[in-house]
């Protein structure tokens, strides 16, 4: 089985951007989300990972624009950012996306999250945004600004709730081009039977090959963002390197 690559389109104020370590104000603009997403589709992506950063930070949303983008794409979309109640979840699913990624809601409102998982099953992935604090993996909430508790306790709870998939981000790596946290990915895979999508830190084709080496342990895919936008490699090159 080959590693699924999900090129990322992060959206702020109607524009595709990349942040460094998720910090507001560190964004670099890359034009229209529609053009970015269509470019990844044309380059061979099977999935595109689209994040509404305004919604994630709680400062507005790009919902209508993103619904239009999802509608134009022929490939599957994983939609993320600010999905934390029935209205935002139903609006996200109504775009026709393949699945949504819940983040903050899984930490702040576990009962609602459990209901969403029970109702929508495979349509729900949970984003585990992790930072190493005093030797322990802690979760980060709302746009990575708030504390979210212990990773392993939350993972055990979500497994019990029947979560179908986890998107694991080492926040300290995201947008830095410093390489993925393979140890964290392996530990999460060991702790759950659900498939894991890796996110954060990918800078080279070799990084993707290293993540692909964890497919047998449970890693299903990898989100790739800044490395593609910065021209470190092309999506066709990356797809060729990790195809089973």
Swiss-Prot record:
Pathway: Amino-acid biosynthesis; L-histidine biosynthesis; L-histidine from 5-phospho-alpha-D-ribose 1-diphosphate: step 4/9. The active site is at 10 (proton acceptor), 129 (proton donor). Belongs to the HisA/HisF family. Gene3D superfamilies: Aldolase class I. It catalyses: 1-(5-phospho-beta-D-ribosyl)-5-[(5-phospho-beta-D-ribosylamino)methylideneamino]imidazole-4-carboxamide = 5-[(5-phospho-1-deoxy-D-ribulos-1-ylimino)methylamino]-1-(5-phospho-beta-D-ribosyl)imidazole-4-carboxamide. Its EC number is 5.3.1.16. GO terms for biological process: L-histidine biosynthetic process; L-tryptophan biosynthetic process. It is an enzyme of class 5 (isomerase). The keyword ATP-binding does not apply. It comes from Rhodococcus jostii (strain RHA1). HAMAP family: HisA (MF_01014). One of its GO terms (cellular component) is cytoplasm. InterPro entries: Aldolase_TIM, His_biosynth, HisA/PriA_Actinobacteria, Isoase_HisA-like, Isoase_HisA-like_bact, RibuloseP-bd_barrel. Keywords: Amino-acid biosynthesis, Cytoplasm, Histidine biosynthesis, Isomerase. Its main location: cytoplasm. SUPFAM superfamilies: Ribulose-phoshate binding barrel. It is found in: Cytoplasm. This is 1-(5-phosphoribosyl)-5-[(5-phosphoribosylamino)methylideneamino] imidazole-4-carboxamide isomerase.
């Amino acid at each position: 089985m080959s590693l699924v690559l999900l090129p990322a389109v992060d959206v702020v104020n109607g524009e595709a951007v990349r942040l460094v370590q998720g910090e507001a104000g560190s964004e670099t603009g890359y034009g229209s989300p529609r053009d970015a997403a269509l470019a990844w589709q044309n380059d061979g992506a099977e999935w595109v990972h689209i994040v509404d950063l305004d919604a994630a930070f709680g400062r507005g949303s790009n919902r209508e624009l993103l619904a239009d983008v999802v509608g134009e794409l022929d490939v599957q979309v994983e939609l993320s950012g600010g999905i934390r109640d029935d209205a935002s979840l139903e609006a996200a699913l109504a775009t026709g996306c393949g699945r949504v990624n819940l983040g903050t809601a899984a930490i702040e409102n576990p009962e609602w999250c459990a209901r969403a998982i029970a109702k929508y099953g495979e349509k729900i992935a949970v984003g585990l945004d992790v930072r190493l604090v005093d030797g322990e993996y802690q979760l980060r909430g709302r746009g990575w600004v708030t504390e979210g508790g212990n990773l392993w306790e939350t993972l055990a709870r979500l497994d019990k709730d029947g979560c179908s998939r986890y998107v694991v981000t080492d926040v300290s790596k995201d947008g830095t081009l410093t390489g993925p946290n393979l140890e964290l990915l392996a530990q999460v895979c060991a702790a759950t039977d659900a498939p894991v999508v890796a996110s954060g830190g990918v800078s080279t084709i070799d990084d993707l090959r290293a993540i692909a080496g964890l497919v047998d342990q449970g890693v299903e895919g990898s989100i790739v963002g800044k490395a593609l936008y910065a021209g470190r490699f092309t999506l066709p090159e990356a797809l060729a390197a990790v195809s089973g």
